[in-house]
Amino acid sequence: MLRKIRIALATVFFLCITLLFLDFTGTFQLYFGWMAKVQFLPAVLGLNLVVIVLLLALTLVFGRIYCSFVCPMGVFQDIAAWFSRLFRKRNPYRYSKPKNVLRYAVLAVFIVLLVLGFGGLAALLAPYSSYGRIATNLFQPLYIAGNNVLAGMAESRGNYDFYTVEYWMRGLPTMIVAVCSLVVVVVLACVGGRTYCNTICPVGTVLGFFARFSWLKPYIDAEKCKSCGKCEKNCKAAAIHIAKGEVPSIDYSRCVVCGNCLDHCKFGSLTYGHPSKQNNSPKTEGNKPADAGRRAFLTATAVATGAALVKAQEVKVDGGLAAIEDKQIPERQTKITPPGSLSARNLAQHCTACQLCVAECPNQVLRPSTDLKTFMQPEVSYERGYCRPECTRCADVCPAGAIKVISKEDKSSTQVGHAVWVKKNCVPLTDGVECGNCARH
């Protein structure tokens, strides 16, 4: 039953969040935009304490249900693993020892990058951001191509319910990052299920620590267990250890509460609930008390996280204006950020680099940055499009508050940069023709 509930909820969340990245009309944002705002990293960078407390509370009660069906990257791994099992006879899942050194090292690097202001690089490790880049750069072109085919077919029959949409590749670096992320995640999912979640993902590491103390969890009745190994072979988190002559154990820091073990146990030895003394359940790896080293590390992590949150609250408007040159199109020293971002510094501190705003921009004026410090975060590029004064789509969809919601009136009066007149490019001077476009626009 638990597995069926998980699959149903995971399907709803995954489809709705994916449609947020694919949709170019803004329709799905009205109904499902909140699903992006309840993702863990956007909530942390946006200082959304309600969502943070809610996710931690749910983890302390039910375990890592966030990783099970809320996180789109987690569900995407399950889909990839399911397809891989169609082409193999044996289930690849086996118990593996926890790689805690690697997990906490990646988490430490993630926090340090956030503290130092390299949010774009830190987002390369974040699950929601990684899936957003995959959906925006790899899935959305296919979605738009399908729409354009339908639009052409409908137009030939006199139906104009569909309309064609132009798509352009937003940069080679962002495409390479998306492809690499897709390959790494799919390979890890096909080989070991939730390996990414339990070795690389910083969100999984944080929630895994709290899940060790969850009130409800799957537990094994040692008296009923026959050590058949069915649960171990179907645990996609490699968290169940069953061995002859040994007490069966579950590592709750890695368990994602998928319910697979419950469905495959034929002896009724597995139960999802609160393990009490009356249940005579064995001690599990996930319930071992933390040693002094672990406590010291968690203390350091808490301090670093606090520093990151304090840093995220700094809002400085730095102008972001490029030096004006009258010789050629100037090289922008500071990238232009969307109205509502307050400043380049504020955008860099709060943006998760999920590229939802890039995917939703109707005029394709936003593109991912290639600068090291703001890598994959959005910047305004007028070389490909223009920003409509009445459009506030990027602010409406931003899940982390990096682009603040702004009224159309305020947007029209917000200066994001200066126009630069390049004399040698002015056709009235070079060709002697009438123009006046700059005055009209």
Describe each region flagged by the PLM:
Residues M1-R254, G259-H441:
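Non-ligating segments of multi-cofactor redox enzymes
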